[in-house]
């Protein structure tokens, strides 16, 4: 065992469990690629100010949870706590919004970092797949992204997730609601930190998970009663599009999410099998974020789905993904000459696109066959001096147990045919 361990609140992904994480990432990314979203990758760290402006200076993410560092040149950087601000920054820097048709549709995958209290389903290092549609204000786009996430979850076999939906209004109607909410909240019995939040961003108080606070919020003014006609019509169109597509959702008037940049449509994916940390993903519209970080007006919408949380949801439902074996053929040489010959065969198979592995280290037949079994290979190649003298190798079907000689010159063609 090493003297060192993974830092508190983080984890290592190792086989075989890592294969499930890769499969989840692929399942989420596949419908995005099929819908015109291009892949984007951003640095693991950014200027601190990007998140302070974009995510919100009063959010827990910025005030308590960011990992920050100072470079030798004095620059203040932060490990990325979320993906949207970085993706929008990169799109603006590359002038993608000027290069072609809008919206600019992007997807990404990576690790993110927040200094949180480690607990089941919540880590200081976590993996997400995200999607952003930049530069267009259209309820069809909001609905598209929600439907694609629903499609991804269902392709994995998940059934016990729910979609929560709300509208946060826009810069025209939200200030009126903000004032009404502040008036209501100031009369409640709240701690000093929460009272400071009332003055900076009162909507965040609605996201408070403490039971004593939630009890006091029962009679809070409803945002829906303050939405302007344009926001009401926009939200109803999103709801209608989801209903027409057969995607079930629940209206949640207190859903505000944890980031300050959201406007109008906001949504969250929750799974009832995950306890208190039930969110597996979420997102919404962020029409003003581009201007917050110094860009032009670019109404946009996006989401991020947690890979870690999705794997936990699969486990909660008892779902085991049908993962392909990483090895189709396993070669077992008996003797030095066989090692050279079979290694050449394995190399030829790999070049032909067959997943092949080799019994390294000169192990005996018994130990090598145990390794072949553990590899999950469908076929095993075995060769000794007598086989080589006859110009053959023994080909064993690991499922049926049948074994027979195959000419060395025909091994690659025979296996390619059998494996389809």
UniProtKB/Swiss-Prot annotation:
Any single GO BP term: histidyl-tRNA aminoacylation
EC assignment: 6.1.1.21
Membrane-crossing segments per the record: none
Alphabetical UniProt keywords: Aminoacyl-tRNA synthetase, ATP-binding, Cytoplasm, Ligase, Nucleotide-binding, Protein biosynthesis
One Pfam family recorded for the sequence: HGTP_anticodon
Coiled coil: none
Location in the cell: Cytoplasm
GO molecular function terms noted in the UniProt entry: ATP binding; histidine-tRNA ligase activity
Catalytic activity: tRNA(His) + L-histidine + ATP = L-histidyl-tRNA(His) + AMP + diphosphate + H(+)
InterPro entries in alphabetical order: aa-tRNA-synth_II (IPR006195), aa-tRNA-synth_II/BPL/LPL (IPR045864), Anticodon-bd (IPR004154), Anticodon-bd_dom_sf (IPR036621), His-tRNA-ligase (IPR015807), HisRS-like_core (IPR041715), HisRS/HisZ (IPR004516), HisRS_anticodon (IPR033656)
Superkingdom field: Bacteria
Annotated PROSITE patterns: AA_TRNA_LIGASE_II
Uppermost EC category: ligase
Subunit structure and binding partners: Homodimer.
Family stated for the protein in its record: Belongs to the class-II aminoacyl-tRNA synthetase family.
Protein name (record): Histidine--tRNA ligase
Originating gene: hisS
């Amino acid at each position: 065992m090493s003297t060192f361990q993974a830092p508190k609140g983080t984890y290592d992904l190792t086989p075989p469990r890592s294969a499930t994480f890769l499969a989840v990432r692929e399942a989420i990314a596949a419908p995005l690629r099929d819908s015109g979203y291009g892949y984007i990758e951003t640095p693991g760290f950014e200027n601190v100010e990007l998140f302070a402006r974009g995510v919100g200076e009063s959010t827990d993410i910025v005030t308590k949870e960011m990992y920050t560092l100072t470079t030798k040149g004095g620059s203040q950087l932060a490990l990325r706590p979320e993906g949207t601000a970085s993706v929008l920054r990169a799109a603006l820097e590359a002038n993608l919004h000027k290069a072609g048709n809008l919206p600019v549709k992007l997807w990404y995958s990576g690790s993110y970092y927040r200094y949180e209290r480690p607990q089941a389903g919540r880590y200081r290092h976590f993996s997400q797949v995200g999607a952003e549609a930049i530069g267009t204000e259209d309820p069809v786009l909001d609905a598209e992204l929600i439907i694609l996430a629903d499609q991804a979850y269902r392709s994995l076999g998940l059934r016990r997730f729910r979609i929560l939906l709300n509208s946060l209004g826009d810069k025209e109607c939200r200030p009126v609601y903000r004032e009404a909410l502040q008036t209501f909240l100031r009369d409640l019995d709240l701690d000093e930190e929460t009272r400071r939040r009332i003055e900076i961003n009162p909507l965040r108080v609605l996201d408070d998970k403490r039971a004593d606070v939630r009890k006091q919020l029962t009679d809070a003014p409803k945002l829906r009663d303050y939405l302007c006609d344009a926001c009401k019509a926009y939200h109803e169109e999103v709801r209608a599009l989801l209903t027409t597509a057969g995607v079930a959702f629940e209206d949640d008037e207190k859903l505000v999410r944890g980031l300050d940049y959201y406007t109008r449509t906001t949504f969250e994916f929750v799974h009832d099998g995950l306890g208190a940390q039930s969110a597996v993903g979420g997102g919404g519209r962020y029409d003003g974020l581009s201007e917050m970080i110094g860009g032009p007006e670019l109404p946009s919408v996006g989401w991020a789905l947690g890979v870690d949380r999705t794997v936990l949801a699969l486990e909660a439902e008892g779902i085991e993904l049908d993962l392909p074996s990483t090895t189709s053929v396993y070669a077992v040489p008996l003797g030095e000459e066989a090692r050279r010959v079979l290694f050449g065969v394995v190399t030829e198979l790999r070049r032909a696109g067959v997943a092949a592995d080799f019994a390294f280290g000169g192990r005996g037949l018994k130990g090598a066959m145990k390794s072949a079994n553990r590899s999950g290979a469908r076929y095993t190649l075995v060769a000794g001096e007598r086989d080589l003298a006859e110009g053959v190798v023994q080909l064993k079907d690991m499922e049926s147990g049948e074994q027979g000689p195959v000419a060395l010159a025909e091994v690659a063609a025979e296996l390619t045919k059998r494996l389809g």
